[in-house]
Amino acid sequence: MKSQSKRTSRLFVFVGVVVAIIIAVLSWRYFGTGSDNNTSGAQQSARGQDTSHGGRRNTPLAPVQAATATEQEVPRYLTGLGTVIAANTVTVTSRVDGELMALHFTEGQQVKAGDLLAEIDPRPYEVQLTQAQGQLAKDQATLDNARRDLARYQKLSKTGLISQQELDTQSSLVRQSEGSVKADQGAIDSAKLQLTYSRITAPISGRVGLKQVDVGNYITSGTATPIVVITQTHPVDVVFTLPESDIPAIMQAQKNAEKTHAIVPVEAWDRTNKQMLAQGYLLSIDNQIDTTTGTIKLKARFNNEDDVLFPNQFVNARIKVDLLQNAVVVPTAAVQMGSEGNFVWTLDDANKVSKHLVTTGIQNSQQVVIDAGLNAGQRVVTDGIDRLTEGVQVEVVTPRSANTDTNPASAEKAAAEAEGSTPHQGRGRPANAPARSTTAAEKS
């Protein structure tokens, strides 16, 4: 009995311990979870109250860059593709036949008019000159003798010792000798001229090209192969074309320049349209339109003192035809294209954005003229446009701050736009902006 009582007592103790453990675990779970839930609920309630009072205060404002619309004097340019040509081009050839004895120029050097370029063997022409001079001396002596005889005949004719026929014959002989002397003088002059032609000089100032004939070759006059070609590049000309629709603007610009005794300025830019090479003026306009292309040719002249323009070089020619006064100008990046047309995002004093439809005018890669829809002094968004909706408040940042955006999504999107994977209509030129008219900003 005692043994059975001990076993029963132990069983009760064991069951009591197990029950106590179970109660402790359940109590901990119940009271601990409840406390956490209460804390979480309090936080959510606080968030709800915060949201109800101030909106999404913990959501950061979208960063954008902005610029202010300004009033400027904007010149209007017409741009056309042109080719640099020498003001004068001379093909140097020999006027006499003979062996090329020497060349007195270096290929590519600048020469002045009158500089000696080449020498032809002068000995044959020296001999011709000597012969002509000898013939002149002979005929001059004959003439002198005939004149003396004529003087005697005239005296004898007065006394009747000779007939009139003999006197006339002697007079004719004198005139014949005078003609021979003149012919001899012409032969001498011709020989001297041929001797002069044996020394070939530069007819104009300019740059010589590559030599076409080597020393020692026999040269004939009138040959198709020149000795060298000289191009005058100080000044130099640019021939370019513009559509026939631009003729009225060009003619008006010429008339305005004539009234003030000024010139119509023309600029030469490189083929990338990023660097201005030279400044010149409009020289002439062709007198007819090319019916094939519907364009007209113009010629501009440049001093080219620094030799930046080279014959046959392709350039972009820009002719200034007008000057817009008090034009409203914004950066090109601010203008967007939508279904309703061109528009910009403007900013009020609270940095809230609003869409404004605008009419664009002259524009280039940096700025665009707003003909209607915007006033000077208004702020417009130039970067971060893809994040905007009507009335949203934004944060205006500097370019440096915008580049250090800590938002991973924004940074990734900006990188994608920089790589060109995300098309951005605002980066390009507005569709209804003039394709060729540019502003002075492209000079910088």
Curated annotation (Swiss-Prot):
Low complexity composition bias: residue spans: 409-419
Disordered as annotated region, ranges: 37-60, 398-444
Entry keyword set: Cell inner membrane, Cell membrane, Membrane, Repeat, Signal, Transport
Molecular function per GO: efflux transmembrane transporter activity
Top-rank lineage group of the source organism: Bacteria
Example of a GO cellular component annotation carried by this entry: plasma membrane
InterPro entries named in the record: CusB_D23, Multidrug-R_MdtA, RND_pump_MFP
Keyword Transmembrane: no
Biased composition (Polar residues): 37-52, 435-444
Recorded topology in the membrane: Peripheral membrane protein
Record's subcellular location: Cell inner membrane
Keyword Cell membrane: yes
Signal peptide span: 1-20
Quaternary assembly: Part of a tripartite efflux system composed of MdtA, MdtB and MdtC.
Family per similarity comment: Belongs to the membrane fusion protein (MFP) (TC 8.A.1) family.
Name of the protein in question: Multidrug resistance protein MdtA
Natural source organism: Yersinia pseudotuberculosis serotype O:3 (strain YPIII)
